[in-house]
Amino acid sequence: MKILITGFEPFGGEVVNPSFEAVKHLPDSIEKAQIVKAAIHTVFRKSIEVLEELIVKEKPDIVICVGQAGGRAEITIERVAINIDDAKNPDNEGNTPKDEVIFEDGENAYFSNLPIKKMVEEIKNCKIPASISNSAGTYVCNHLMYGLLYLINKKYKNMKGGFIHVPYLPQQVLNKKNVPSMSLDNIVQALVCSIKAILKEYNDE
């Protein structure tokens, strides 16, 4: 079993992005599954292109994309991605798409085919707050999640995939009053726990 897990580079003036900080601290294997870690550009279109290059190269069984959700207090497992880009702020190359369809031949929305409720349950069993989210937004996180699920639907039908949002790190909120954060250790542990839940689901099939 091979799992590709990605995190984003920093964006929006931040020096770090907790998603890739956590991803790069993951072990190289979890319960005999190989863990392949990669950074993704916080850029519309390019993010999906890089992800597909990684899929072609690595041929993973499971793909988990991880992103930063500043302002959220817990780990959130995304249920659905929608076929729209609507950026309030520019991406890392200055793109600000407004009400743009991601793929003309794609569905209005695609649902994660990961065991999202079992992932939340396992993270909570690890004493870390978690919940299901029903909106990944309309920025690059939703864009990449939609792109992943589109690719699964169109080309890689045996592959499983989904998206996890993580909170800010403590150092990111030093000058952000009343904004929640989570330690890097807890974010890393939450990712490990979610991967274990996924592996249990598919190893039991």
From Swiss-Prot:
Its EC number is 3.4.19.3. InterPro entries: Peptidase_C15, Peptidase_C15-like, Peptidase_C15-like_sf, PGP-I_bact-type, PGPEP1_Cys_AS, PGPEP1_Glu_AS. The keyword Protease applies. Keywords: Cytoplasm, Hydrolase, Protease, Thiol protease. Its main location: cytoplasm. The active site is at E78, C141, H165. It is an enzyme of class 3 (hydrolase). GO terms for biological process: proteolysis. GO terms for cellular component: cytosol. It is found in: Cytoplasm. It catalyses: Release of an N-terminal pyroglutamyl group from a polypeptide, the second amino acid generally not being Pro. One of its GO terms (molecular function) is pyroglutamyl-peptidase activity. Belongs to the peptidase C15 family. Removes 5-oxoproline from various penultimate amino acid residues except L-proline. Homotetramer. This is Pyrrolidone-carboxylate peptidase. It comes from Thermosipho africanus (strain TCF52B).
